[in-house]
Amino acid sequence: MIQMQTILDVADNSGARRVMCIKVLGGSKRRYASVGDIIKVAVKDAAPRGRVKKGDVYNAVVVRTAKGVRRPDGALIKFDNNAAVLLNNKLEPLGTRIFGPVTRELRTERFMKIVSLAPEVL
């Protein structure tokens, strides 16, 4: 469950290390984002010589949450951290690699590229 001001780890090699959610996209009163939702983020910590720099604003898709995601069979998939993958304006991933596992809920038309790059899909 991601809301405004939430700090997330970045699960790609775009150069950002940590980002902060500044808006949950999808409706004017929308408060929370979960796995697979698109959020607007500001880069808070970036690696030197990376593709992004501190202060940049990007779209991102949430790939892991500590709150978890409930499956129709009743299983609950939780993670140790909240993580996101940075996206460009066409909603394509900025990085060329994905670090850590992602959930099967990302297997939609929009995020198949992220699923194919991920080392593990839960």
From Swiss-Prot:
One annotated GO biological process: translation
Gene Ontology MF term list: large ribosomal subunit rRNA binding; structural constituent of ribosome
GO cellular component, one term: cytosolic large ribosomal subunit
Disulfide partners: none
Keywords: Ribonucleoprotein, Ribosomal protein, RNA-binding, rRNA-binding
Gene3D superfamilies: Ribosomal protein L14
UniProt xrefs under InterPro entries: Ribosomal_uL14, Ribosomal_uL14_bac-type, Ribosomal_uL14_CS, Ribosomal_uL14_sf
Subunit-structure text: Part of the 50S ribosomal subunit. Forms a cluster with proteins L3 and L19. In the 70S ribosome, L14 and L19 interact and together make contacts with the 16S rRNA in bridges B5 and B8.
Function as written in the Swiss-Prot or TrEMBL entry: Binds to 23S rRNA. Forms part of two intersubunit bridges in the 70S ribosome.
PANTHER family the record matches: 50S/60S RIBOSOMAL PROTEIN L14/L23 (PTHR11761), LARGE RIBOSOMAL SUBUNIT PROTEIN UL14M (PTHR11761:SF3)
Family: Belongs to the universal ribosomal protein uL14 family.
Listed name of the protein: Large ribosomal subunit protein uL14
Annotated organism of origin: Neisseria meningitidis serogroup B (strain ATCC BAA-335 / MC58)
Gene: rplN
